[in-house]
Amino acid sequence: MTISLTPLDLSAIRADFPILKRVMRGGNQLAYLDSGATSQRPVQVLDAEREFLVTSNGAVHRGAHQLMEEATDAYERGRVDIAAFIGAAADELVFTKNATESLNLVSYVFGDNRFEGTSGDGGDVIVTTELEHHANLIPWQELARRIGATLRWYGVTDDGQIDLDSLQLDERVKVVAFSHHSNVTGAVAPVRELVARAKEVGALTVLDACQSVPHQPVDLHGLGVDFAAFSGHKMLGPNGIGVLYARRELLSVMPPFLTGGSMIETVTMESTTYAPAPQRFEAGTPMTSQVVGLAAAARYLDAIGMKAVEAHERELVAAAVEGLSRIDGVRIIGPKSMENRGSPVSFVVDGVHAHDIGQVLDDDGVAVRVGHHCALPLHRRFALAATARASFAVYNTVDEVDRLVAGVLRALDFFGRE
């Protein structure tokens, strides 16, 4: 794949996303500000998937014919490219159907007595944060229920960041799970500090990186986390593909989550021995074309340069926070400054329900998310039923931020001002 870009040539980038040219039902061109929920795909990703399907589609790791060989090569080459994009080794990556499955895989293994992640004596503690997406909370609730452990969590400060003073860890803690970027407040976690605290008590760390991998340079080896998860559809890639990263020495001793074909060494009627990692964790027919598409997305972002992506998105977020903060009656849920802040910008408007904000913006062709964003405990922390959320990607413009602010003003005039 070739992509010719000057430093963040927005015209060239936007030309790669045909959907951005769409005129919506209100007669306005689409301003897509919902990439935190799912991102749009560039033609390079669509073309990579299509090229694979029309030329090399075959069963991976099975048989000896040419299509099988080409499919297997494409699948494993994709693993190499994706691993390089996040600062990991290829044999440390497991493909799943989404980040939720990746996090469930890890939590399931922690409850398996073949893995020495927990003691199983009922005295273990599992730690997460009040900021979490349900995908990084409910699996740990279930693990605590299954093994009789206690679930504890870091609280949240009034500006939507992890409150490091709210919890002290001890040797009973076995796992600390947290998000790199909050999908609601946009707060960036102090990853190295949390990893250091976990290591002091012998706990393992699990990072939900869904909101960070598409938006900034991420080096998982450099961060020092033990596990990490992210989804393809949030980083310009296909639906139906997620990634689990695990340190090699952990992955090599972890028992499987799902069992069946493709993940075995030998099978008898009495017992089974399993393939080495990562194949041990990829039971059944894999999502080959989606891996090809996700690898194309990683190459696309890498060609632009993740530092340039991060700088561009910081400009957009700063403009959104500043513009919304100037509106009387609008409250940002999250940090007001750009220090330790990611892409999502969530807000509420006095006297106007979030769904009404979303409807007015939709009439203007501006797509945002409204609701609790799969983070009910966090919304309860702020005594809110719902927020509106704008979230940005490399293809967004300052003009689209201006349209967001104008739409909120229009909604406030219509619903909230006498």
Curated annotation (Swiss-Prot):
Gene3D superfamilies: Aspartate Aminotransferase, domain 1, Type I PLP-dependent aspartate aminotransferase-like (Major domain)
Catalytic activity line of the entry: (sulfur carrier)-H + L-cysteine = (sulfur carrier)-SH + L-alanine
Swiss-Prot/TrEMBL keywords: Pyridoxal phosphate, Transferase
Domain of life: Bacteria
Leader sequence segment: none
Name of the top EC class for this enzyme: transferase
The protein's required cofactors: pyridoxal 5'-phosphate
Biological role stated in the UniProt entry: Catalyzes the removal of elemental sulfur and selenium atoms from L-cysteine, L-cystine, L-selenocysteine, and L-selenocystine to produce L-alanine.
Family in the record: Belongs to the class-V pyridoxal-phosphate-dependent aminotransferase family. Csd subfamily.
Protein name: Probable cysteine desulfurase 2
Lineage, top ranks: Bacteria, Bacillati, Actinomycetota, Actinomycetes, Mycobacteriales
Gene for this chain: csd2
